[in-house]
A protein has these predicted regions:
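Glycine/tyrosine- and acidic-biased, solvent-exposed loop/turn segments at the edges of beta-strands
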Residues: 20-248, 252-286, 290-303, 310-318
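Bacterial Sec-dependent N-terminal signal peptides
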Residues: 1-27, 236
Length: 318
């Protein structure tokens, strides 16, 4: 299967919530949005000071209960650009996933586990340009029984919380093959059927709770700007105003703005996800909010609201 990157431009650390100095604490929603108060957050992120001669920041995420959620290393504090081993945990403390990053992208083998500690699946990630090829190597059931071995077998996949079967079908040489059936529960429930040859989807059909039928050949189509992304940047260039406070201090930089493209093409939930001067952040959000011509994304053929990230650069030209 191939998953294109939608971002344009684009060892364990601490086992208990630390109380040490030389660290920064952030509050985040599951969407990745940074919020000001713990009461607004879904989890807590602690970024430790870099060790001498170390280029990476140790980053630990915690559930609101204080139990560890994930640990990893990053080149940047906000947003993280992970490098090397990254481990996530269930709130019980059991290991959920073990993976490796290179330059912020998942590479090599990802091992996922059931809440009971049994190996769930192993996936192999390979980078081809801006796309990622993902091969299914191993799939087991919760008792440890093998369903897929060496890239061949009948796979059963679950939702992230292991509450229901999300999809099932045949794996051949690490890729989806033949008919796949499943349930998609983002923005309402959809039942779907898809047909694959050599990992490439030929066609898909989904049905929502009201009986509406959707046909598609791409399971996920990201949002886009009317006329293309260059048209969006022309809109930015014609309307952006360099903040005087930032210009006076000769502050430049790139602002990464995350937002939702709603089902009607409007945008919402606009927020900045990297550490920049507040004046640059405010202006980037203002110009983005003034853009009106967004085309919503689709999942399983149905129009849905979808998250998007876009960079806006500020340069004084000297």
């Amino acid at each position: 299967m191939k998953y294109a990157s939608y971002l344009l431009f684009i060892s364990f650390l601490l086992l208990k919530l630390p109380a040490a100095v030389c660290q920064q604490t952030y509050y985040l929603k599951n969407s990745g949005e940074y919020v000001k108060k713990k009461e607004q957050a879904d989890f807590i992120r602690v970024v430790q000071k870099r060790v001498k001669n170390q280029v990476l920041y140790p980053i630990s995420d915690f559930y609101l209960s204080g139990n560890k959620k994930s640990v990893g290393w990053s080149y940047m504090k906000v947003p993280p650009v992970y490098e090397g081993q990254y481990v996530s945990f269930f709130e019980t403390g059991a290991t959920k996933q073990v993976m490796k990053y290179a330059g912020g992208k998942i590479v090599d083998t990802v091992q996922s586990y059931f809440p009971n500690g049994k190996l769930y699946k192993s996936l192999l990630y390979t980078q081809v340009g801006d796309s990622t090829n993902i091969y299914v190597i191993t799939v087991n059931d919760s008792t440890g029984k093998s369903l897929v071995a060496n890239g061949n077998g009948q796979a059963i996949f679950y939702d992230d919380a292991f509450k229901y079967i999300s999809e099932q079908g045949r794996i051949s040489n690490g890729e989806y093959e033949g008919e796949w059936n499943g349930v998609f529960k983002t923005s309402g429930s959809l039942r779907f059927k898809e047909f694959y040859v050599g990992g490439k989807m030929l066609k898909g059909e989904s049905v929502d709770e009201q009986g509406n039928v959707f046909h598609y050949t791409n399971p996920e189509v990201p949002p886009s700007y009317e006329g293309g992304i260059n048209n969006f940047y022309r809109h930015v260039a014609s309307g952006i105003r360099y903040p005087p406070a930032a210009a006076a201090q000769r502050i430049q930089g790139k602002v990464h703005v995350k937002f939702l493209v709603l089902a009607d093409g409007k945008i919402g939930g606009v927020h900045v996800i990297n550490d920049v001067h507040p004046a640059l952040a405010d202006e980037a959000m203002r110009i983005l909010k003034s853009s009106k011509n967004w085309i919503p994304g689709r999942q399983k053929g149905r129009i849905v609201e979808m998250t998007y990230i876009i960079p806006i650069s500020f340069s004084l030209g000297y």
